[in-house]
Design a protein with these regions (language model features):
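Short beta-strand/loop motif that positions the catalytic acidic residue
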Residues: 203, 208-215
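Catalytic nucleophile-loop/oxyanion-hole region of alpha/beta-hydrolase
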Residues: 55-56, 62, 79-116
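Short amphipathic alpha-helix adjacent to the substrate-entry channel of hydrolases
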Residues: 56-76
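Short beta-strand element of the alpha/beta-hydrolase
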Residues: 39-48
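Mobile cap/lid helix-loop segments that gate and shape the active-site cleft of serine hydrolases
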Residues: 4-13, 164-199, 205
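Primarily recognizes the serine-hydrolase "nucleophile elbow" in alpha/beta-hydrolase
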Residues: 100-177, 191-192
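Short beta-to-alpha linker loops that shape the active-site pocket of alpha/beta-hydrolase fold enzymes
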Residues: 49, 73, 78-82, 165
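A domain-start/cap signature at the N-terminus of enzymes
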Residues: 1-28, 38, 89, 175-177
Length: 215
């Protein structure tokens, strides 16, 4: 899924809000804390934004720096934003980018002094939905792929869901996120596939979920 977009970023008091993303990236924030002979845990951080943008500092970089203070290395995902993509690609791009990010982190774990079995994912709002999608739609590596990195597992070892969107089914779906991810009139197969409470399986990683009475 390529696109012909021009990169677009806005700014507010919280920092950068990426809108149109041409090339997905992971921004690496290594923890400088060291423990003798113990590799670090790592977390892939996924900002929210309703699948129309990415609140990159408030729910990304700032969180990565906080994780660093705990001795955890962090990666912030700048994924392609579904709202701006073609109808054929909008439901695919964010998950593809999250899966590739997890593969890259795990494949480079020795080089980055990371425990390959302690790589989690943390997401906010729509980023929480992508986090739960990655957790329920992962693989253990695509052995037949001609792309070497795709042979690495995309499964997170744990997930942290912060005021997440979870379901795409009314009446509990966040309809803005649903529309931006699946389009105006999605088919029922897509709605069910991305309703992650229905997709939990035996190898889904453990999760912790936060909501407040203001969410």
């Amino acid at each position: 899924c390529g696109n012909n977009l021009k990169e677009d970023v806005e700014y507010d008091s919280s920092g950068r809000i990426f809108k149109k993303v041409v090339n997905p990236e992971i921004w690496y924030y290594p923890s400088l804390k060291t423990s003798k002979n113990i590799k670090k845990a790592a977390v892939l951080v996924i900002p929210g934004g309703g699948y129309k943008g990415l609140w990159f500092d408030k729910e990304g970089v700032d969180v990565a720096k906080w994780l660093n203070s705990l001795g955890i290395s962090a990666f912030v995902l700048k994924h392609r934003v579904p709202f701006w993509e073609s109808n054929d690609c909008r439901s695919k791009v964010a998950l593809l980018d999250a899966q590739r990010a997890m593969r890259i982190i795990r494949a480079n774990s020795d080089k980055w002094d990371i425990n390959r079995n302690k790589i989690g994912v943390l997401g906010f709002s729509a980023g929480g939905h992508l986090t739960s999608t990655l957790s329920t739609h992962h693989d253990n590596g695509l052995e037949l792929s001609k792309i070497e990195i795709d042979k690495t597992s995309s499964r997170p070892d744990y997930s942290i869901l912060v005021y997440p969107v979870i379901t795409m089914k009314p009446p509990y779906a966040h309809m803005g996120s649903r529309k931006n991810l699946l389009g105006e009139i999605p088919n029922e197969e897509h709605v069910t596939y991305f309703s992650n409470e229905l997709q939990v399986r035996e190898d889904t990683p453990p999760a912790i979920l936060f909501h407040t009475d203001q969410d």
